């Protein structure tokens, strides 16, 4: 479940040109509880369809890739939407 970035980014001296989201398959209910808590603490709004938001996708991607969430803040908009859509599809269309 790799995503090739249209435009690579550099964060703290590390060049990132793709993201491997395969780790989503190993997430547990406990992992999701911590993601939902972090989402709320970071200002995520509402309790309905959090999984469809960019912030939720950034938190999930950070958790499964091991990259800090700040890396996901500097992705170009198109790559950010690509990550969001991939996370959404995992939870709603493949599950």
Segments predicted by a language model, with ranges:
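Short, surface-exposed, charged amphipathic helix/loop patches that serve as local interaction elements
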Residues: 1-95
